[in-house]
């Protein structure tokens, strides 16, 4: 069952109840009864009417639904092991100084070049 809210008092309006008023600028207002409609046309602010939901909300006379706030999901950085290297080894490499890292990288490059040369010699045809 679809219900709407009264534009003035904010009470629920059930189907086949209430009335609609269409203003000149095509804005549609839903009212629950003629009492509310007359207050609206007299431009009486609903904050001043003690039984309206606006008044009750301002002065905390109504029990509001206490809904738990949804916690925003925060991304967490998780350290995971890489196949062939444990977490301790990775952390040790991160803690190394840049000079040590550079030297290790150059050493690895030299080893790769030597392996390529050795493979090229084996693959080279004999004369």
Swiss-Prot record:
Residues 115-127 have a biased composition (Basic residues). Residues 93-127 are annotated as: Disordered. PANTHER family: 60S RIBOSOMAL PROTEIN L24, RIBOSOMAL PROTEIN L24. CDD domains: Ribosomal_L24e_L24 (cd00472). Belongs to the eukaryotic ribosomal protein eL24 family. GO terms for cellular component: cytosolic large ribosomal subunit. Keywords: Ribonucleoprotein, Ribosomal protein. InterPro entries: L24e/L24_sf (IPR038630), Ribosomal_eL24 (IPR056366), Ribosomal_eL24-rel_N (IPR000988), Ribosomal_eL24_CS (IPR023442). This is Large ribosomal subunit protein eL24. One of its GO terms (molecular function) is mRNA binding. Gene3D superfamilies: 6.10.250.1270, Ribosomal protein L24e. GO terms for biological process: cytoplasmic translation. The keyword Ribosomal protein applies. It comes from the Eukaryota. Pfam families: Ribosomal_L24e.
């Amino acid at each position: 069952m679809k219900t709407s809210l009264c534009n003035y008092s904010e009470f629920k309006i059930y189907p086949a109840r209430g009335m609609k008023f269409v203003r000149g600028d095509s804005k549609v207002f839903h009212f629950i009864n003629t009492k509310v409609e007359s207050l609206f046309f007299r431009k009486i602010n609903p904050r001043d009417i003690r039984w309206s939901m606006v008044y009750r909300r301002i002065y905390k006379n109504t029990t509001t639904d206490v809904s738990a706030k949804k916690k925003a999901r925060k991304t967490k950085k998780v350290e995971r092991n890489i196949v062939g290297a444990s977490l301790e080894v990775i952390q040790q490499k991160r803690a190394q100084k840049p000079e040590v890292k550079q030297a290790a990288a150059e050493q690895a490059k030299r080893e790769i070049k030597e392996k390529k040369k050795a493979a090229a010699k084996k693959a080279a045809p004999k004369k």
